[in-house]
Design a protein with these regions (language model features):
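N-terminal loops that bind phosphate or other acidic moieties
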Residues: 1-132, 136-380
């Protein structure tokens, strides 16, 4: 038998790689001589670059960029081959990079994300995938675009630096300096984005995500006014209303900038990851796929790893099952997306803290139970 293991990480306990190692241990105990392969996968959030690089044997590319508070930072993105690159905006512009006492979305910038993109283009990459979760910013992506040559001018014609507080001050957008390789559509951009928020309004970038980035109600009102000004200018420049583009409000409005200036495609994170790693090709000859995540519930069918893996397996006619930490309301919906069965790691009533402390032991036990059940079913 040939097994393929492709589970998401269990937050705070098990990495995607570790789940594959434990599944391999259990499978070899129950099915001696079986063939096992593990894939690190992610849904476009934290760890996406590492997961993709591991799956395709890619390489890290270090680069020095500006952090969210304009400090210099050493970060990395990934090269899959000579043409394709993958990166996380959180590497350069992520919330964990900003100390809690300094969190103010009026001051943070995506400039460093733009520097990563520029570095990738300079190195010859022409197919760039960008994960935009975990941002510290609410600058509408103007910092990122400024790093790529766009100028945002105030009423006196002075160039703005590119942070959230600058949005309300913009009077003119000058795209004449935008990197010609981008202008001439020589670079393809894919943005991993699973939120559908518009740029402005109650569900927009400021009011939906600004609070978690340190924004007070007064700050959010200021940022919303700035976003509305920015939206109107983008409409004038590109003829597109970013309040009508699902995902434009992602990452503090970075989704809008990448769409408008770079002609990027906004796409599900897990779908992008599975495409990058050539998942369907890896299903050839596989008897069973085992996937999973920390908790299965109604949210699992919305762009999560289990849904993505299960749907691909269903399409290719390969059975898939899942091991999860726990199950919540609506978990059974995943059965409509290619997952045949779910096994939980928790084997009795216990506090969450105990379940996390015993994560490896409990996961291995669940894997053994699952493979024993599979062995029994083969004899029917």
């Amino acid at each position: 038998m040939k097994f393929l293991f492709a589970s998401d990480s269990f937050k705070g306990t098990l990495s995607s790689r570790r789940t594959a190692e434990l599944l391999t241990q259990a499978a070899e105990e129950i099915f001696p001589g079986c063939e096992c392969a593990g894939l690190e996968v992610a849904d476009g959030g934290e760890g996406t670059t590492e997961a993709v690089l591991s799956a395709v044997d890619g390489r890290r590319i270090p680069v020095s960029v500006k952090g969210p508070l304009w400090e210099q930072r050493e970060v990395f993105y990934g090269a899959l081959d000579e043409n394709r690159a993958v990166m996380e905006m959180a590497e350069a512009s992520g919330l964990p990079l900003v100390p809690k006492e300094l969190r103010d979305p009026r001051n943070t910038t995506t400039f460093g994300t733009g520097e990563m993109i520029r570095d990738a283009i300079d190195r010859g990459f022409r197919d760039i995938s960008i994960a935009i979760g975990g941002s510290a910013t609410n600058d509408g992506g103007i910092g990122c675009m400024r790093a790529l040559g766009v100028r945002f001018l105030d009423e006196s014609g002075q160039e703005l630096r590119g942070c959230g507080a600058d949005l309300i001050k913009i009077r003119t957008i000058d795209c004449s300096g935008l990197d010609t390789r981008i202008k001439e559509r020589k670079v393809r951009f894919t943005v991993m984005c699973d939120v559908k928020n518009p740029l402005c309004g109650a569900d927009g970038a400021a009011y939906t995500f600004g609070k978690q980035k340190g924004g007070t109600p007064e700050m959010l009102d200021e940022l919303e006014a700035g976003m509305q000004n920015y939206r109107d200018l983008l409409l004038q420049e590109f003829g597109v209303n970013m309040d009508e583009v699902p995902g434009a409000g992602a990452a503090g409005g970075l989704g809008a900038a990448l769409t408008a200036f770079l002609n990027a495609e906004l796409k599900s994170g897990i779908e992008t990851v599975l495409d990058l790693i050539g998942f369907e090709e890896k299903l050839q000859g596989v008897s069973l796929v085992v996937t999973g995540e920390g908790r299965a519930d109604w949210q699992s069918v919305f762009g999560k790893v289990m849904q993505g893996v299960g749907s691909r397996c269903q399409r290719m006619g390969v059975p898939a099952v899942a091991i999860v930490g726990s199950m919540g309301t609506g978990a059974e919906q995943i059965f409509d997306h290619g997952i045949e069965s779910i096994m939980t790691t928790v084997n009795g009533i216990m506090p969450l803290e105990e379940a996390m402390e015993r994560a490896e032991e409990l996961y291995l036990g669940a894997a053994r139970r699952m493979f024993r059940m599979l062995r029994a079913a083969r004899g029917l």
